[in-house]
């Protein structure tokens, strides 16, 4: 994963260099990554893991998966709200005449990248569930999937001799495809373990604690 990350960074600088587009992409990618650290890999996961573990021990996988569905539904609704509001605000900012060019480009690219937040935060919760039932391979491979997707997008842009202004959007698409795969692959693995996605609106004791 680290080698692929290094290759990705090398390709990013080979294609975008120290250009305005590179700075704008880094700025845009910071926002979903911040939410990933706060929601996907931060406080929320730290709160969910012990509760999921307790339910898994007391009620087995059926109860644990029900709790997981409760968490995923509420997280999905929260993320949809923030992504929707964020995209509207970013579209307005990117079209504002008073915004510096770099910030305007960053806001425009962030409109493309903000949905990545949806994929990666949901993926983090599912991966936490997989880890707790002893499934480690797929969660560990998710960063590799993102790097491969971004590398593929950059290579495609280079192969087509695209300009930096076009390659940066290829890179955004690569991030979105990678994020979708980061959610899809753990979901498939969890489905094989007996999980079934359900819309569970009721809040049990564990959700109240959470």
Question: Could you tell me what each predicted segment is?
Answer:
Residues 1-210:
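Membrane-embedded alpha-helical bundles of multi-pass transporters/translocases
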């Amino acid at each position: 994963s680290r080698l692929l990350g290094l290759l990705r960074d090398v390709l990013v600088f080979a294609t975008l260099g120290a250009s305005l587009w590179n700075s704008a992409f880094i700025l845009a990618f910071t926002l979903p990554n911040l939410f990933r650290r706060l929601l996907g890999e931060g406080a929320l996961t730290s709160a969910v893991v012990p509760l999921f573990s307790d339910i898994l021990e007391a009620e087995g996988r059926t109860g644990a998966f029900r709790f997981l569905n409760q968490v995923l539904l509420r997280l999905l609704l929260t993320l949809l709200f923030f992504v929707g509001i964020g995209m509207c605000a970013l579209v307005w900012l990117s079209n504002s005449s008073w915004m510096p060019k770099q910030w305007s480009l960053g806001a425009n690219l962030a409109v493309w990248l903000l949905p990545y937040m949806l994929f990666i935060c949901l993926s983090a919760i599912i991966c936490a569930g997989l880890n707790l039932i002893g499934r480690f391979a797929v969660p560990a491979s998710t960063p590799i999937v993102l790097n491969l997707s971004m590398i593929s997008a950059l290579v495609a842009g280079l192969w087509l001799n695209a300009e930096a202004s076009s390659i940066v959007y290829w890179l955004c698409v690569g991030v979105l495809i990678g994020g979708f795969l980061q959610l899809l692959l753990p979901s498939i693995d969890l489905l094989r373990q007996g999980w079934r996605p359900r819309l569970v609106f009721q809040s049990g004791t564990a959700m109240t604690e959470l």
